[in-house]
Amino acid sequence: MLRNAAAGARKAVTELSQFPKPGEKLHGFTLVRSKHVPELELTALHLQHDKTGADYLHIARDDSNNVFSIGFKTNPPDDTGIPHILEHTTLCGSEKYPIRDPFFKMLPRTLSNFMNAFTASDHTFYPFATTNAQDFKNLMSVYLDSTLHPLLKKSDFTQEGWRIGPENPLAEDEASKKLVFKGVVYNEMKGQMSDAGYLYYIRFHDHIFPDINNSGGDPQKITDLTYEQLQKFHAEHYHPSNAKVFTYGDMPLIDHLKQVDTQLQAFEKIQGDKQVHEPVTLNGPKEVTLYGPLDPLVDQDRQYKTSVSWIMGDTTDVLESFSLALLSTLLMDGYGSPLYRGLIEAGMGADWSPNAGYDSSAKKGIFSIGLTGVQEGDVPKLKEKVQQILRDARNKGFDKTKIDGSLHQLELSLKHKTANFGFSMLNRLKPKWFNGVDPFDSLAWNDTINGFQAKMAEGNYLEGLIDKYLLNDNTLTFTMAPSTTYGEDLVKEEQERLSTRIQAAIKEAGSEEKARKHFEKQEQELLVEQNKTNTEDLGCLPTVHVKDIPRSKEAVVVRDENANGTKIQWHEAPTNGLTYFRAINTLENLPDELRELVPLFTDSIMRLGTKDLNMEQLEDLIKLKTGGVSVGYHCTPSPTDFHAASEGIIFTGMALDHNVPVMFDIIQKLVLGTDFDSPEAALRIRQLLQASADGVVNDIASTGHRFAMGSAESGLTRSAWLRQQVSGLSQVQLVTSLASRPETDKLEDVISKLKQIQNLALVGGNLRTAITCGSESVAANGASLQNFVGNLSRDPLNLKNPSPRQLPKDSKTFYPLPYQVYYGGLSLPTTSYTSAEGAPLQILSQLLTHKHLHHEIREKGGAYGGGAYSRALDGLFGFYSYRDPNPQNTLSIMRNAGQWAVDKKWSDRDLEEAKISVFQGVDAPKSVNQEGMGRFLSGITEEMKQKKREQFLDVTKDQVREAAQRYLVDGLAKGEGRVAFLGEKQAWVDGEWQIREMDVKGAE
């Protein structure tokens, strides 16, 4: 009865008959058309605003995680980053919310599980997601007013965009008074442009789409942007006539339309910037070579990045675009694909280039095939080799099994119920929508699949696409060569540009002293403006309330079974005919030398193949029969003792219910059957290592603060130390060291250890499993699991108990890396998950982030990001900064934050906001396969979670102060803090710091 009622409710949300008919008016909008898409369980409605012409797409679906986005077409007129700086400054105060930074001030006043803003190459959009109806209205009000009626103050432009000012205006020494370029976006883009992968993609984009300038901004050009240009660009582009609004979920469309119409009615219709830029015309071969940064952790001889690109057809042809994406998968995806085998396996490069594959986000599709880690002598050979592989693939044709495998992956992606389906939908539709592709065509999955299968039935369809687009020389070959002086050249250029600006200011002011006074005065005025953030009245901002948060949450129902010695956690839930499997094999006394190679082991078993099946055959089987299987390293502290840690190997898999036995068979084949003795095993493992090492400096930079935090934490707890060995900077050093071994090295010592891991991965240790599936599949899955475990000859492990390891004692560690900005972390030990003191620490981290650190580290210090965190399970409290130009200042702020929190007179509102922030994460929607996983992975029971929930709701101001005193102030005084920073080594990194060079062992 209840099930039928739920089905009825689901149907009601998407029932076409409840919506207006095309042509009908609705709160200032006219419904243009509607479409029910049963395969996605949704109904799409396209509306247009009568007065302004604003486009509106609503997707009705029985999903409580509702999404909103407003976006604008923002073709950048130059490389000054005007769309990017505007994206930042619109969020610094608006007519209805005239306070500093309402976007960040809203973060602790909302239960949203996602809030952000993004600048794409030719459009800018502002999305959020929440399950709370009042919250949705609140955020929509702030987003609409921020984008359509921003204050755009000059001080916001200088803070977020760029300015010249003293390096540290609060310090008295001469070095701190040195004039430098500053600004949040300026520093962000300096960080981005020192990432060789990002730089390659941006410069490639410059040449394939010469009419689309760099929307993010080139630091060399950002300093040309004026405040007046920013205002003009906003007036012309952030207008309803140039807007696309998107809503998704189960909340009533009528409520959304009323609210949006109220905001749009103030505008008259104008001619929006609807220009859709075409790529370059290629009537023959074109070659471009530019210089980029050298990666000091990779073989100096393999530093080139190069690619060959073709222009495809119009992406409004959704069927052809889908087919080209599938063709790209068949040609490039997986170790058995022809291009992987012919290029990377053949040793021409280490990995795919950042632009590789089919890109359908613009008006015309772009098909690129390229490599990183290429030797200079191989660069001119790439195009001919690619053409040869494409001709061979075209003549051979495509195996139906491989095509069916790709279509099967598509089927599973539709069935898999994710918590962020609406946001994924927005990301899939939005870029094409802004470039003229009808979103209704993009939504018509079944029509596209049926059309594809009809074309395939005619014969030679994919081969015909290769003929049509790829077997010609209308190509762009784009190469980035390494320059040993690239970083120095950037610094020199910046100094010259700064000097020119200062000279111009001196000329205008009449003297050097007057010019300096002008810059110092501007900086002081900005500081005064920034300091208002601590005292201004936020009463105008809407908020949800702690009283609206339920004191208890419906528990996830799981049950335990011990079937013939196999421990199973069952979670029965509606899964759309899918079964999700996890298993953990806990390993006691795992030696360090084996642990650090577990990531290489898990990569190797997805690469080498078995004695009976090569990797291509295994990949085909995985795609055809599962939604993916994986093997990885697992470690967790105990919820009752954060100093204790258990570790092991984790196995995951997903499949349609009837394919579960095959999924188990595949896992067994991969783990136990991988052939480490094959003649090419050493070569394949070397290629895996080289692919991991290639671009590692850029990979670190993309999450540099996480690497810094991980390094700091590794000196505090066993669990954090284990993580550092497997996924931190220690792992990076191991991989780069192994990758740099000479080609003559057969890696016998490494392979011997990988075989030891293979012998204990699945059959040694203590195995426990978890299955999430529909009730109707429990019996069959139980039998399949019994069969799987029964086939494993499980032996007791005989690993020697290692002597207890002392954690590193270095209180300050510095990693010299070639970045223009810094990444840092400071960490302290706290208490276990079940301790009552954990809740005040979590609240404290939110208070410090929103009330202090964001203001000090980002707004005043110029870093792209900074904050505090408390990880209850890990028993750690810490601070971080990201893309930070001012690390000394940041470290001082971190060290003094505890005392600041003790001295601060917290208000009831402060506490309320911090609790709301915590519950964004606590109550964020979960995908069905994540339910019950805290218990399985780490032993956190529903009772523990409920207790923690009540503790969060009941935290007092005194408890927060006590936690700050005990764990931060006293902890630092006792020397319990650990610090790590990454970046360029300068004079301030003195003898107190332990310097950890990241050099490759054995490299010249």
From Swiss-Prot:
Describe how the cofactor binds. Binds 1 zinc ion per subunit.
Q: Give the stretch annotated as transit peptide in the record, renumbered to this chain.
A: 1-34
Tell me which residues bind Zn(2+): 84, 88, 188
Q: Which GO terms describe its biological process?
A: protein processing
**Tree of life domain:** Eukaryota
Q: What is this protein called?
A: Presequence protease, mitochondrial
Catalytic residues (UniProt): 87 (proton acceptor), 160
What does the record give as the organism's lineage? Eukaryota, Fungi, Dikarya, Ascomycota, Pezizomycotina
Origin organism of this chain?
Answer: Gibberella zeae (strain ATCC MYA-4620 / CBS 123657 / FGSC 9075 / NRRL 31084 / PH-1) (Wheat head blight fungus)
